[in-house]
Amino acid sequence: MSSAEYYPFKCTPTVYPADPFDPVEDAAILRKAMKGFGTDEKAIIEILARRGIVQRLEIAEAFKTSYGKDLISDLKSELGGKFEDVILALMTPLPQFYAQELHDAISGLGTDEEAIIEILCTLSNYGIKTIAQFYEQSFGKSLESDLKGDTSGHFKRLCVSLVQGNRDENQGVDEAAAIADAQALHDAGEGQWGTDESTFNSILITRSYQQLRQIFLEYENLSGNDIEKAIKREFSGSVEKGFLAIVKCCKSKIDYFSERLHDSMAGMGTKDKTLIRIIVSRSEIDLGDIKEAFQNKYGKSLESWIKEDAETDIGYVLVTLTAW
């Protein structure tokens, strides 16, 4: 399953398939790194962070053939903590990885609503539906039912709408429809006492990104206000964050991810799970574009932020994935 099926636009990754590539040789290096006293973490990083996911899976197959052992099991027994988390993330195909991340966000202590928003708001229809299938196969319950059971109110309705994966993905703009939708959004929010959340939900969830950009332009022409400011005034909490994420992704998904990375490292502490998820999942898609946007917006390279903020072993893996 190719990344192009999830993101059908030309993007710049930072991780490319290794060439030349010998999975048997790589398996031998990993075996040596984990055999005997101690573990050679650097050798593990140099192999797994410099191969594409398809190659990593070929290495795992060669490892089992050569040594009669499961590579994932050996990695789990040798590694620990967040370093184990990032290495296992590298060994997980994208649909399963996102399914696991969603399950963790739903079933952990409290609900990680920002992770749910980030994943569901940035995937194509195909991506959402594929991940929903893997989720049900892996956990025995539908993604929709788990979201319903763990969220409430307007945010629950937003999640249920998103997980249907029914956004219009046709190209082209209908200007008359954009004007009508802009008026409907205004009437549902700033133009009345109280807010009709369902109108915002319906329009933001179903219209194509190209159409939404025209709607936002027409909204500003109509009201004199940016749609993001209107959402901030009319909503609060998780549903506000969800609607804003849709708007930001519509304007620039690259900028949205660069902002998420910055927020994961800014202030006290590091949101390691967010940092790992974005770096690993985007490394073979568009991390090259994201790191350029990060540099332009924050005046400092993504690599330098990671080096200063992340723990040593995790930081080395993530910097390796981020480097060209």
Swiss-Prot record:
Cysteine disulfide partners in this protein: none
Entries under PROSITE patterns matching the protein: ANNEXIN_1 (PS00223), ANNEXIN_2 (PS51897)
UniProt keyword list: Annexin, Calcium, Calcium/phospholipid-binding, Repeat
Ranges of the Annexin repeats in the UniProt entry: 21-92, 93-164, 176-248, 252-323
Pfam families: Annexin (PF00191)
A single MF term (Gene Ontology): calcium-dependent phospholipid binding
GO cellular component: cell cortex; cytoplasm; endomembrane system; nucleus; plasma membrane; vesicle membrane
Highest taxon in the source lineage: Eukaryota
The UniProt record lists the keyword Calcium: yes
Keyword Repeat among record annotations: yes
Free-text note on domains in this protein's UniProt record: A pair of annexin repeats may form one binding site for calcium and phospholipid.
Family: Belongs to the annexin family.
Protein name in UniProt: Annexin B9
Organism: Drosophila melanogaster (Fruit fly)
